[in-house]
Amino acid sequence: MSVADTIARPYAQAIFEIAIENNTIEKWKNILIFIKTIASHKKFKNFLSGSISPKYLSLIFITIGTNIIDENAKNLIKLLSENQRFNILNNIFERFVKLEACYKNIIIVQLKSAFSLKENLINKIRKVLERFFLKKTKIIYKVDPNILNGMIVKVNNTIFDLSAQNHLKQLSDSLNF
């Protein structure tokens, strides 16, 4: 786990607890997307270098997001600004999404294949994984021609590598002892 992930965890946890308490998970997801989008904009990055005061930086975010930002979001922005933590917004968002998935009893699966898979095959894979893990499954699918043939399935810290690239590596390793 990276340092940024470690720092982001308590922020994401606190935000998620507020979201659960107020039944505003989707709203908070949108707020986090909004804040991280602004913070990552190339013109805005100059402000994040520390050249302006945290109070003024907070005011800029709050002014831009008048329609979406409530009191709790204002407090988050002030806290991120005072602690110079806008650089970990992606980590906070990713952790928030993981907390949401856990709360809703969903696992997030990363699926890579060497070529494009048809939707019905992806659905079959989803059903197998749902039966295996006894949870709803959200698949994030990507095509990666570097794996030659087959697929790689990643669930949390577990990787099922069914790629030709992996089989060739295992064969090579066994021949080289």
From Swiss-Prot:
Lineage summary: Bacteria, Pseudomonadati, Pseudomonadota, Gammaproteobacteria, Enterobacterales
A GO molecular function held by the record: proton-transporting ATP synthase activity, rotational mechanism
The keyword Transport is assigned to this record: yes
Coiled-coil ranges per UniProt: none
Originating organism: Buchnera aphidicola subsp. Acyrthosiphon pisum (strain APS) (Acyrthosiphon pisum symbiotic bacterium)
Name of this protein: ATP synthase subunit delta
Membrane topology: Peripheral membrane protein
Gene name linked to the record: atpH
Keywords: ATP synthesis, Cell membrane, CF(1), Hydrogen ion transport, Ion transport, Membrane, Transport
Function statement: F(1)F(0) ATP synthase produces ATP from ADP in the presence of a proton or sodium gradient. F-type ATPases consist of two structural domains, F(1) containing the extramembraneous catalytic core and F(0) containing the membrane proton channel, linked together by a central stalk and a peripheral stalk. During catalysis, ATP synthesis in the catalytic domain of F(1) is coupled via a rotary mechanism of the central stalk subunits to proton translocation. This protein is part of the stalk that links CF(0) to CF(1). It either transmits conformational changes from CF(0) to CF(1) or is implicated in proton conduction.
Subunit structure comment from the entry: F-type ATPases have 2 components, F(1) - the catalytic core - and F(0) - the membrane proton channel. F(1) has five subunits: alpha(3), beta(3), gamma(1), delta(1), epsilon(1). F(0) has three main subunits: a(1), b(2) and c(10-14). The alpha and beta chains form an alternating ring which encloses part of the gamma chain. F(1) is attached to F(0) by a central stalk formed by the gamma and epsilon chains, while a peripheral stalk is formed by the delta and b chains.
One cellular component (GO) term of this entry: plasma membrane
Location of this chain's protein in the cell: Cell membrane
Pfam family, one: OSCP
NCBIfam families per UniProt: ATP_synt_delta, PRK05758.2-2
Protein family (similarity comment): Belongs to the ATPase delta chain family.
